[in-house]
């Protein structure tokens, strides 16, 4: 009798994705982040669901309902902090996952890569709207500043912003609709992640060497299930440490003050995972130019496959490109630091230089390095 996991219509899908899937024999820990992102997403959906049971999306009671969750709901504080810090873990895994794709040339699997970019935008939108929900000072002013960027769009800008707000400022209507979107988007992300996997399994995974691995495949289970389990354990350990020892480490103290439209906080800034994009936005004096740079800072990922000039897929054997890649990482860390600083000398000029360097590395230096390395390999 044939094993049920290979014949049952539903079990067959799971079997072909998680058990009998042929995987390259040499994929490193950098390939763990896909499963970790899946775990983060499930964790966020579950903690979010329990938070939604006690949260009220009304401007007058939203802040109090979050305080009520932390004080009066059984283990409400741990659910709330797991959700807030789970988002940080989600973004750490996302950045690692995208960085791995850039380093090892995984962007050449174009369908998977493009769905990944859509996923990145969707997760960023979800995180932004989630940050508005506690209705603290930074929630309110963050929502005001970021939605206001759309007013830079010529002709329809102002109307568009007021349409999103549901009035003439960020108010009750804005909070209610943000809650509705924040609730539905994770399920859309889940569906997109399934499509992401579907496209990946059409071609199979890339591997660190960048050489096709069809001649050397191993079953996903038990080799990579146990490897993913170790990664999951380490992620849970990191998250638990953060939640139980310093839950407010990555948050903003201003968000413990209820939203007040009459008092602007001295420094409006988003959560840490948006600071690099926020720094790029601020480094351009023109409003529309800043918005375009902000969008393009993420959208640039879509043209990376077109700029691939090297004969080799990954950067494993390309020292010039490796140097540029790590320079890019250092540049992004610099931008993240600048995004959290006030707009004054010397931070303005550092931010502008870091922004120029970011686009220069990706659009100019990396393609040139690929060509140089092709020529060097002829020697």
UniProtKB/Swiss-Prot annotation:
Give the membrane topology.
Multi-pass membrane protein
Question: Where would you say this protein principally sits, based on its record?
Answer: mitochondrion
Q: Which domain of life is it from?
A: Eukaryota
User: Which GO terms of type biological process are on file?
Assistant: mitochondrial electron transport, ubiquinol to cytochrome c
Cofactors named for this entry = heme b
Transmembrane residues, as ranges? 33-53, 77-98, 113-133, 178-198, 226-246, 288-308, 320-340, 347-367
Q: Subunit structure, briefly?
A: The cytochrome bc1 complex contains 11 subunits: 3 respiratory subunits (MT-CYB, CYC1 and UQCRFS1), 2 core proteins (UQCRC1 and UQCRC2) and 6 low-molecular weight proteins (UQCRH/QCR6, UQCRB/QCR7, UQCRQ/QCR8, UQCR10/QCR9, UQCR11/QCR10 and a cleavage product of UQCRFS1). This cytochrome bc1 complex then forms a dimer.
Know the name of this protein?
Cytochrome b
Question: Which organism's genome codes for this protein?
Answer: Ursus thibetanus
